[in-house]
Swiss-Prot record:
This is Sphingoid long-chain bases kinase 2, mitochondrial. Pfam families: DAGK_cat, YegS_C. PROSITE patterns: DAGK (PS50146). Coiled coil: none annotated. It comes from the Eukaryota. The keyword Transport does not apply. Involved in the production of sphingoid long-chain base (LCB). Is required for the cold-induced accumulation of phytosphingosine-phosphate, the regulation of the cold-responsive MPK6 and reduction of root growth at moderate low temperature. One of its GO terms (biological process) is phospholipid biosynthetic process. The gene is LCKB2. InterPro entries: ATP-NAD_kinase_N, Diacylglycerol/lipid_kinase, Diacylglycerol_kinase_cat_dom, Lipid_Phosphate_FormReg, NAD/diacylglycerol_kinase_sf, YegS/DAGK_C. One of its GO terms (cellular component) is mitochondrion. Disulfide bonds: none annotated. Substrate binds at G118, G119, D120, G121.
Length: 364
């Protein structure tokens, strides 16, 4: 479903930006080429008419249907705030993976930005739409200076990615970010299985208990953020810590005994606000890996507050390291250790995780 509209000021927004996003440049009527790096270099592209072409990818089923209702309320604000500067296309997803296809088509058609409207799941699909067969999707005209930015209006069950940037779940603020038109370059993670089945993530990927909990949580999204608690309780039933083999940056294999969960963060939060990879910065060219070992159910109960406020790195049996790539295998080869990224179930180990520095520009 496609609705095209032209969509001026609503509510002033002056929130402080994270330090890793300070190198920015406003979108103007000029065209710029990007200058590489993962540190937040900024640039801008608009259509030949001088108006920005924005594609909003909306998941109407998000948050048990709440996304569709909130989006309908937001549309008048979009038209009011953005009318002088942009052309807006609204595209509603019809099912799983549809946002990926919509995004690829929009980029090939030369959109200046694709904005995910929904939760982390919708954002995850839109990010994957920026890539095809291991390469960035390009504008079909071959125009080297043309680059599509990623945007976000958080209206879903979970908005963990937005937390890293200090963004509230306020659609008015999101519209103001889009109106300002500032771009910053950020990293993206990519996951593969023996060189195949490439999958991209922008927030956090994880292995074993947390991934299993996320798998179960997805079945209870009608309960809102409570779904994460229900998923964790269900995942604990029959859970066993596992010995794993890990290789960092192509080096020697290391044995990690009794792994409870392994998390690979491009950003900081997952699971409805848990600051699991607190040192992750999505523009520094690295991923943060946090490993929890030999945790029992009561460890989570006693240390849950530390996991949420990001102080768990000082806890025994918790380690953290910065990597460009990490390969993870289970030693027993049971084929039953869950893998997920940005809350989406990807299957089971083995997997390789690596960073793509400065892979996407985000409206910030």
């Amino acid at each position: 479903m496609l609705r095209s509209t032209c969509c001026t000021p609503l509510c002033p927004f002056t929130a402080k930006q994270p330090s890793f996003l300070r190198k920015q440049q406003r979108i103007t009527s000029d065209r710029f080429t990007f200058r590489g790096g993962g540190g937040g270099d900024a640039a801008a592209v608009v259509s030949s008419s001088g108006l920005r072409d924005l594609v909003f990818v909306v998941n109407p089923q998000g948050a048990n249907g709440r996304t569709a209702k909130e989006w309908k309320k937001l549309l008048p604000h979009l038209r009011s705030r953005l009318g002088k500067d942009c052309n807006v296309s609204e595209l509603l997803t019809s099912g799983p993976s549809h946002a990926i296809d919509i995004t690829r088509e929009a980029i090939r058609d030369g959109a200046d930005a694709v904005i995910a409207v929904g939760g982390d799941g919708t954002l995850h699909e839109v990010v994957n739409g920026f890539f095809w067969e291991g390469k960035p999707v390009g504008y079909l005209s071959g125009e080297a200076s043309r680059s599509t930015a990623l945007g976000l209006i958080p209206l879903g069950t979970g908005s963990d990615f937005a937390r890293t940037f200090g963004w509230n779940n306020d659609p008015c603020e999101a519209v103001e970010r889009i109106a300002r038109g500032m771009r910053s370059r950020i990293d993206v993670g990519v996951i593969d299985k023996e060189g195949k089945d490439l999958h991209y993530f922008i927030n956090v990927a994880d292995v074993h208990l947390s991934a299993k909990a996320g798998f179960y949580a997805s079945k209870y999204k009608k309960f809102g953020n409570l779904c994460y608690v229900i998923g964790a309780l269900q995942a604990f039933m029959g859970h066993h810590n596992q010995d794993m083999r890990i290789r960092v940056n192509g080096g020697e294999w290391e044995i990690y005994p009794q792994v409870t969960a392994l998390c690979v963060g491009n950003a900081k939060y997952f699971g409805g606000g848990m600051k699991i990879t607190p040192n992750a910065i999505p523009g520094n060219g690295n991923l943060e890996v946090v490993v929890l070992q030999n945790f029992k159910w009561y460890d989570f109960v006693l240390k849950l507050h530390k996991l949420y406020n990001g102080t768990h790195l000082s806890v025994n049996n918790v380690t953290s390291r910065s990597v460009q790539s990490i390969e993870v295998e289970e030693i027993t080869d049971s084929g039953s250790i869950y893998v997920q990224s940005d809350g989406e179930h990807l299957g089971f180990l083995p997997r390789k995780f690596q960073v793509l520095p400065g892979a996407i520009d985000i409206i910030s």
